[in-house]
Amino acid sequence: MSSDSTPEGFVHEQRAVRVVFRAGSCAELPREVERLGLDRVAVVAGRRYADRVAGMLGARAVVVVADPRMHVPVEQAEAVRDRATAARVDGLVAVGGGSAVGLAKAVALTHRVPIVAVPTSFSGSEMTRVWGTTAGGVKRTGRDPVVAPRVVLYDPELLAGFPTALAVPSAFNALAHAVEARYAPDRTPVTDLVAEAAIGTMLTALPALAADDPAGRAGALRGAWMCGMSLDSTSMSLHHKLAHVIGGGFALPHAETHTVLLPHVLGYNAAAAPDAAAAVGAALPGGAEPSAAGRALQSFAAGLGAPTRLADLGLPRDALDRVVDTVLDAPYANPAPLDRAALRELVERAWSGAPVP
């Protein structure tokens, strides 16, 4: 049995969620809100969708937030919470990417009201009970079942026009959830199956997504659904810790940070998590041995035009030691030991874009 095979003993938790996946499903939003018995909802959506969604919901939309910000700044979360209190909201509708869903989660955390989510990116956040806010350059995360959307409407038509320069990193963001779920210490036979299916679905969809093919967008959306499912039932490890420290601490773009880091962390963990590395290697075009999966994933990402250097995202080189120190101050469980020197080499390579060893 390999070192990252599913433990013989495990605890598996699965929450109830209604998922509607079909073209045009966004039009079903009013019916789903009514089905939950919601009368006074706060709409959290990007500017592209806010007015449209508010119009669909009519008098039920008592608050409209059209400017969700990346990494959920706590000051914005508090402001929207105050508006929700004043309007006596009994539910939330989040339409957009991870920022919209994340802000809705921050409000649900304090107001204990249900969320209906309509994702327009591949973040996978809509399928998890994970929440996060950022204050003073520090990203704080946690888990609470109340923040997990009760209903998720996946509508591939909403992704038409999603620029490939943003879509591809968004898909890698979701992929990271499944990769870490596959080597999580609390994985189960179910999460292993979902994570491997998610990895295969997303890596298969990515070339078509990069070519702006509608089939690629639909495939990546299915992959994001499964990637989020796998993360919802497992713990996060080194990859997510690094992404939270770097993204939240230095205001780097969220999905792009995940994209750069994932091959390096996979390479770091490959020997200790060969099953996860094998799942990635098997799904890549042409295949790759587990020991080479990290480098193969890096080459694959570069070939799709994805970012490969933290330096290009705005991380200063003199911040690398601080990144490592912050990760080690409160580490997440990880299959490979967190050695400071090795971790420092990892972030240096990710910063410069050097090949994964």
Feature names for model-found ranges:
Residues 1-90, 310:
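ATP/NTP phosphate-donor binding region
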